[in-house]
Amino acid sequence: LHSTSRRQRQMCIRDRDSIKEDASAIWFLGDLFDYWYEYKYVVPKGHVRFLGKLAELADRGIEIHIFIGNHDIWMFDYLPKEIGAIIHRDTLTVDLLGKRFFLGHGDEVDFRSKAFRLIRAIFRNKFCQWLYAGIHPRWTFGFALGWSLNSRKSGLEKQEAKKYQGEDAEYMVVFAKEYLKTHPDINFFIFGHRHIMLDLMLSRTSRILIAGDWMQFFSYIVWDGENLYMDQFLEETDGQSYPLSLIHISE
């Protein structure tokens, strides 16, 4: 959300506002922010209206679930304390309205790159986080935001980030197929991270969905207890947008 225009942020808020009457839970699948780090007394500026809308939804009894992504790993206790959000740091298997879901950002099941796994382990290491927290935010925020935006732009420009790779090469699909062999009770695998929209049958009782993003597709997933489907929030924009994958659970 750091690099968005005011109009785009308002669009995001209107989308959350449109579901407040019938949603029972909202699940954000990671990378809610381009960069987020919580010091003991300092958090990133901005996001007031968006976080205010989430607080309003939480006050109405709607559960707010947030998976950490690879861009906002360093969420700690600020959002749980301020808006009652539930933070998930790894994949989660959960029953929702009668079906079994396997949820995650998606980078958790990417076992292809040793370098990526090493960086991820360093970023999640508590001692490394403690060392990083000792650096003044004047230096860390500018550097990290620049790195994050660079990483996102270069990633979206790569062919890998633009196109579906096929069942045998798309690593989330490969993971889901293997996992399903030992956990046949999973009805839906749902991930973000890849910036593609995908809805694929894995078996007669199981599907995998990759939720797209809010930079290109303005996409989200709805589960009402009977039907699970992907939809898009359609409104004219002025070009750039922001990554935001979510699941909206309604009753």
Q: Where in the sequence are the language-model features?
A:
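Single conserved hydrophobic/aromatic residue that forms the stacking wall/gate
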Residues: 1-9, 13, 247-251
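Short, basic, glycine/proline-bearing loop/turn elements
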Residues: 7, 35-40, 157-165
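Core catalytic region of metal-dependent phosphoesterases/phosphodiesterases
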Residues: 10, 14-96
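Conserved beta-sheet core of the metallophosphoesterase superfamily
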Residues: 82-89, 102, 107, 112-126, ...
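Structural motif
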Residues: 96-97, 223
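Active-site-proximal loop/helix segment associated with metal-binding centers of metalloenzymes
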Residues: 106-171
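C-terminal or late-domain output modules
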Residues: 227-237, 242-246
